[in-house]
């Protein structure tokens, strides 16, 4: 397209005033450096070499304290980091999640075993951190690049943290209403930038121009974040997702908010839509 055409139809990008310290989720690989020390951080580009880093400026400052706690625990009890070349070792990743509005914290260790040795000692230290709500392990014993396995076991607290997404209106993005609450597990898909998510969803809702008479389909709905947000203005919302646990979470999120005009289906979008449409008729 010609640049002048693009300029004529493109609206101004809605940016962030402070584009730092916003990520509500982080996943840190655990391994050894060249000197054999246990480290965590991020992979160098196109490699599986970990660059030690405990304090990414996009993440929350609390991540550093969590990682220090985990690494100190591993050193004290001689818990081995995972070695992907040999498929040996225990701790593969440290996953953290944060509720932007609730200030709740989740820590989940991805491990190469069915049990974490000395787990009680780790819990004893992590619960000292402000806002700690959920401590769990995720079991992944496969030789794979996929971070999370299928099974999660709670070590302390709840399996979930809770967060809210608020409707924002006007040029200054004023909050309207109490927001929609969401339960978030280690495996849940949830937008990582809570500030921009509210702007994005509110803009989508405004563009939809819902009057309260429409039926809306949300394909690949995950835990129902967009579905339940749109349910505030739609007559009926239908969500479709292939992951059963995500749909279970979506239904629980609807109950959590007292939303009765949202229905969720498990299956492929291409299979569900036609069949569900006939049923709804």
Where in the sequence are the language-model features?
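SAM-dependent transferase fold signal centered on methyltransferase-like domains
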Residues: 1-162, 167-180, 202, 206-213
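Rossmann-like S-adenosyl-L-methionine
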Residues: 118-120, 124-281
């Amino acid at each position: 397209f010609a640049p002048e055409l693009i300029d004529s139809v493109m609206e101004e990008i809605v940016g962030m005033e402070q584009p730092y310290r916003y990520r509500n989720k982080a996943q840190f690989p655990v391994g050894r450096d060249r000197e054999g020390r246990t480290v965590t951080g991020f992979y160098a580009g196109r490699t599986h070499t970990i660059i030690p880093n405990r304090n990414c400026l996009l993440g929350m400052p609390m991540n550093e304290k969590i990682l220090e706690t985990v690494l100190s625990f591993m050193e004290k009890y001689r818990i081995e980091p995972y070695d992907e070349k040999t498929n040996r070792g225990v701790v593969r990743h440290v996953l953290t999640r944060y509720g932007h509005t609730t200030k709740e914290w989740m820590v989940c260790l991805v491990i190469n075993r069915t049990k974490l040795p000395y787990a009680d000692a780790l819990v004893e230290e992590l619960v000292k951190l402000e806002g700690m709500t959920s401590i769990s392990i995720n079991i992944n014993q496969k030789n794979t690049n996929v971070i999370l396995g299928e099974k999660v076991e709670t070590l302390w607290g709840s399996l979930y943290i809770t967060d809210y997404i608020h409707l924002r209106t006007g040029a200054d993005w004023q909050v309207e209403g109490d927001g929609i609450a969401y339960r978030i597990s280690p495996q849940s898909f949830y937008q990582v930038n809570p500030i921009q998510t509210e702007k994005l969803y509110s803009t989508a809702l405004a563009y939809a121009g819902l009057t309260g008479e429409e039926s809306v389909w949300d394909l690949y709905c995950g835990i129902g974040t967009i579905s339940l947000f749109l349910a505030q203005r739609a007559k009926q919302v239908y969500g479709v997702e292939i992951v059963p646990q995500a749909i279970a979470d979506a239904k629980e999120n609807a109950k959590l908010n007292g939303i009765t005009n949202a229905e969720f289906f498990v299956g492929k979008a291409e299979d569900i839509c036609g069949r569900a449409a006939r049923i709804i008729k």
